[in-house]
Amino acid sequence: MELFFMNKQNHIFTMTDGHKIAATTYFPGNEIIGHIHILHGMGEHQRRYEGFANYLCDLGYLVTSHDHRGHGNTAEENGGLYGYFADKDGFERVVQDVHEVLQQIRVHHGMYPLTLFGHSMGSFIARRYAQLYSTELDRVICCGTGATTPLHVIGNNLAKVLSRVKGPKTPSIIMNKLSFSSFNKKIPDVVTIFDWLCTDEQEVQKYIEDKQCGFIATNQFFADLTSGFIKIVKPKEIKKIRADLPILLISGSDDPVGENGKGVYKVADQYKQAGMKDVTVSLFEGMRHEIINERHKQQVYDVVTRWMNNEKI
């Protein structure tokens, strides 16, 4: 169920290539202390973060978000094709969308210290954004992120072949299965194919029943996304980030995307090896992929709040 906000404003922003992007602004009831922009994950949409946005607004933050290309109301605004970024360079185009959306939001609502919060696919987009625009960011929070592995390189090559042979806009059952079929392996008493998302059965059921969630993305989408995975771990790209940018990596200890924590620490090590001075990791015991939807999500909220306030976590 969508939360009701007296202080919520919806926008449709036009990108430089003519694509329409659906975005939302949530206004705090008191003085604005900063700006947090939320980047949602694959196969979902921005409205799933309204509870988190409400919490952040109560703290005094201006909170904004948008639906990526091929997702949510952005997909509906552009012909209804889900799970497709662009005809070419889709990952970079989606990162550029973030920049253009933020530029327009800041023209409308002012320049405040900016924190980028990215979940899952959104965390990979945030990691690339930080490589290109770190001077415009005050902080970055990567939620449910993971490491790039040799399997992503293999998947990238396969997705490119599938895009050429079967069509770029064809839903990729093969890539979807290769990407997600193993995610429930360590979960006891599996009920649905999406149990890996969260331990809260009601949240999983809401995801399943949401028509804008859980769709199978296209061949070209998987090619674009894996291309992004490969690019963001290149040392020369990581070194583009200003060394003093604070980065928080948060994840569930039972999140398969982060390899149950191993991949998250690998990402942190890559940042530290590149000379970054302020990288923090926080794992939440017993939580899965969507930690801000877990039963004990307040633990996550509290850690984010303390980190934003420069307090020990």
Language-model segments: what does each one mean?
Residues 53-81:
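Conserved alpha/beta-hydrolase
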Residues 274-313:
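Catalytic active-site module of serine/aspartate enzymes centered on a nucleophile-bearing elbow/loop
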Residues 85-106:
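Alpha/beta-hydrolase active-site loop
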Residues 4-30:
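N-terminal cap/lid segment of alpha/beta-hydrolase-fold proteins
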Residues 109-120:
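Alpha/beta-hydrolase fold nucleophile elbow
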Residues 126-212:
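Alpha/beta-hydrolase-fold enzymes
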